């Protein structure tokens, strides 16, 4: 009997009940959605960074790093892996306003990529491993010839793999570009061996006597080209700076991953999600609570006679109290259920390959994740 009365009363106050359910739905939906968003960002990016050995620190020296320098850095206690690294923006020959960030990671255990299709990485390969998004946007296929322009010379090779890289998860040409545009800019990797071939050809073009273009001469030129070392390490910046200075006998620039545009922007998006997930739900839930208090007071005042009748019929105070409490429980259950669905939709609208973040992040996996405190 009391159950039927609950639904009759709910129908009588349907406007108030619907508004409370909507407010709770919005509050729970936004709370769950944005908390899922920031947690998904951290969960998916951390896995992607681990899969591609995203560098913890980047070391810069305009004079370049020798192979001996690399050995000394790699030998520092606390450095797990290190590589000499090159990244330079080059134009695509024959194409207007189209360029690539050409990367070379000498030790392919740091700053690597995952192959989406095509050949796996080969340190002696002669081809290019190209961003799959850039290839798709510009109609490049596996096996197509790609030619890059570098200081008056051509660097040519076939596209042997389509990839995604943590170093270019947010693929922008420089700090002035706010959003990725794969129609005009992407990235590619080539092998250290192909880089040495390019250096040899560059020395020839520069008028260097061919009989003097020895392996030692190429090594010297290569040392100047590698002006960056990427490392994996759990050390703090100050400790690493001191250790590198002691190892190399000179001071160089050390930047942590928190200063790198990819990591910095990803964590910035995560912090925005945390803020949205903690502020906005309070507003909607506060409105729902105020509406509920007002409505329940109105119901209790209007149904004094009915409450007296129920007591006369033998209903105990505890059961009557439980009945009127069930109004709030009913509203909360319905609103929470709808809010959980809305929260998932909010998360997927933001964190999916075809969602808002899909135009900003380039990752192979978009698994939605929920923090333990937001599990409904």
Spans of features found by a protein language model:
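Membrane transport/envelope proteins' first extracytoplasmic loop
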Residues: 2-289, 298, 317, 352, ...
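Alpha-helical transmembrane segments of integral membrane proteins
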Residues: 15-22, 276, 327, 331, ...
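Helix-capping/transition residues at the boundaries of transmembrane alpha-helices
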Residues: 23, 301, 310-312, 335
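Short, flexible micro-motifs
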Residues: 30-32, 121, 164, 291, ...
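Small-residue-rich transmembrane alpha-helices
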Residues: 249, 289, 293-298, 303-305, ...
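Internal alpha-helical transmembrane segments of multi-pass membrane proteins, especially GPCRs
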Residues: 268-281, 305, 309, 321-330
């Amino acid at each position: 009997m009391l159950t039927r009365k609950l639904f009759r009363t709910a129908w009588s106050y349907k406007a108030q009940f619907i508004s409370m359910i909507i407010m709770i739905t919005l509050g729970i939906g936004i709370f769950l959605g944005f908390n899922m968003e920031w947690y998904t960002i951290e969960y998916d990016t951390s896995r992607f960074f681990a899969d591609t050995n995203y560098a913890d620190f980047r070391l810069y020296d305009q004079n370049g790093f020798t192979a001996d320098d690399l050995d000394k850095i790699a030998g520092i206690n606390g450095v797990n892996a290190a590589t000499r690294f090159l990244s330079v923006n080059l134009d695509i020959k024959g194409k207007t306003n189209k360029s690539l960030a050409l990367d070379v990671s000498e030790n392919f255990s740091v700053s690597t990529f995952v192959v989406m299709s095509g050949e796996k990485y080969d340190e002696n390969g002669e081809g290019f491993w190209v961003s799959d998004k850039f290839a798709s946007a510009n109609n490049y296929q596996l096996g197509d010839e790609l030619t890059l322009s570098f200081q008056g010379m051509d660097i040519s090779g076939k596209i042997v793999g389509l990839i995604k890289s943590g170093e270019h998860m947010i693929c922008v040409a420089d700090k002035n570009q706010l959003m990725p545009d794969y129609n005009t800019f992407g990235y590619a990797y080539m092998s250290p061996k192909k880089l040495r071939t390019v250096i040899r050809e560059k020395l020839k073009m520069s008028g260097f006597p061919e009989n003097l273009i020895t392996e030692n001469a190429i090594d010297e030129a290569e040392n100047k080209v590698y002006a960056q070392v990427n490392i994996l390490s759990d050390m703090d910046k100050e400790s690493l700076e001191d250790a590198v200075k002691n190892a190399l006998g000179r001071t160089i620039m050390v930047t942590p991953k928190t200063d790198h545009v990819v990591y910095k922007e990803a964590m910035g998006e995560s912090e925005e999600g945390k803020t949205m997930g903690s502020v906005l739900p309070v507003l909607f839930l506060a409105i729902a609570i105020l509406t509920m208090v007002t409505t329940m007071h109105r119901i209790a005042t209007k149904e004094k006679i009915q409450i007296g009748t129920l007591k006369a019929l033998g209903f105990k105070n505890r059961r009557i109290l439980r009945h009127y409490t069930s109004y709030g429980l009913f509203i909360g259950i319905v609103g929470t259920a709808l809010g959980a669905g809305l929260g998932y939709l909010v998360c997927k609208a933001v964190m999916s390959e075809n969602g808002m973040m899909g135009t900003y992040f380039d990752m192979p996996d978009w698994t939605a994740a929920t923090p333990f405190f937001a599990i409904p």
